[in-house]
């Protein structure tokens, strides 16, 4: 409804009182809930056990450095220099268990101390975390998506190459292979690779390592199924999957010797697969 003109103005007779005090404000209150979850799951103890005996100590401790990097990623940081923007946030310091955050150079030197051995320990830490969570979810089937991902890098990074990033052709990048649970998005395993590698290269050793991890994590291996793109349509991968007795779905490339176009043109009956998606099944023995 229309307001009276006399009801719109407000009288201001003096200055607003301002009081300055030492008040600890934060922009990342959600870290407290995350921190409680980590304490309940004894995350710090897991980190110390995994990295025991490695040269990753330092003044801050390995658990504090790991939690600081986790906090940096959670709040949206993408570069080590972004740690400086979090130095005065009390909840970030509380989450990391530190009274004072390290400088970006200190974090960089700590990361440079990583070797292939300590990277393997990091894989063990991730496997241990997922191994605790996944059985408790009671999933009847576990769908594992295996695919290559693009990680952009700086200009002076070893084994990073230009031209292989489909969205940023001029940006150097890595091309790691990653496996995650489709139902929950938990990352099971990741392995870094050069930026110019084919997606299916070295996929079989990665799948073997992933399977060893699943044997120790999943109670019903018959309920495991894999999903992969066309780069994994290889004889060695298909034989390996068939030998494990698991379900799988792999995109089939349009190789000329498959002559899939002819089957598509002549197929009369298509069955619905998903909303706005239909298909048909084809069983045929082929030799390339």
Predicted features along the sequence, with ranges:
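Dynamic "connector" segments at or just before major functional cores
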Residues: 1-198, 203-219, 244
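Alpha-helical scaffold elements adjacent to nucleotide-binding pockets in ATP/GTP-utilizing enzyme cores
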Residues: 206, 236-240, 263
């Amino acid at each position: 409804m229309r307001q009276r003109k006399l009801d719109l103005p407000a009288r201001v007779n003096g200055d607003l009182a301002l009081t300055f005090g030492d008040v600890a404000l934060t922009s990342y209150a959600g870290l407290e809930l995350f921190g409680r979850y980590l304490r309940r799951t004894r995350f710090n103890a897991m980190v110390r056990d995994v990295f025991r005996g490695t040269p990753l100590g330092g003044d801050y401790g390995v658990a504090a450095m790991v939690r600081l990097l986790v906090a940096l990623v959670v709040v949206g940081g993408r570069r080590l220099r972004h740690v400086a923007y979090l130095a005065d946030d009390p909840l970030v310091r509380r989450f990391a268990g530190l009274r004072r955050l390290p400088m970006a150079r200190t974090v960089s030197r700590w990361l440079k101390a990583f070797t292939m051995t300590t990277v393997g320990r990091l894989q063990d830490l991730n496997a241990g975390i997922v191994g605790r969570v996944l059985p408790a979810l009671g999933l009847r089937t576990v769908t594992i998506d295996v695919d290559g991902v693009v990680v952009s890098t700086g200009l002076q990074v070893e084994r990073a190459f230009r031209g292989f990033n489909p969205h940023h052709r001029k940006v150097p990048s890595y091309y790691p292979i990653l496996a995650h649970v489709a139902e929950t998005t938990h990352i099971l395993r990741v392995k870094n690779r050069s930026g110019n590698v084919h997606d299916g290269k070295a996929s079989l050793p990665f799948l073997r390592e992933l399977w060893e991890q699943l044997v120790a994590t999943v109670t019903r291996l018959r309920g495991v199924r894999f999903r992969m793109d066309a780069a994994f349509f290889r004889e060695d991968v298909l034989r390996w999957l068939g030998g494990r007795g698991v379900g799988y779905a792999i995109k089939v490339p349009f190789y000329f010797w498959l002559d899939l176009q002819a089957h598509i043109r002549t197929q009369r009956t298509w069955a619905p697969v998903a909303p706005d998606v239909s298909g048909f099944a084809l069983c045929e023995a082929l030799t390339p």
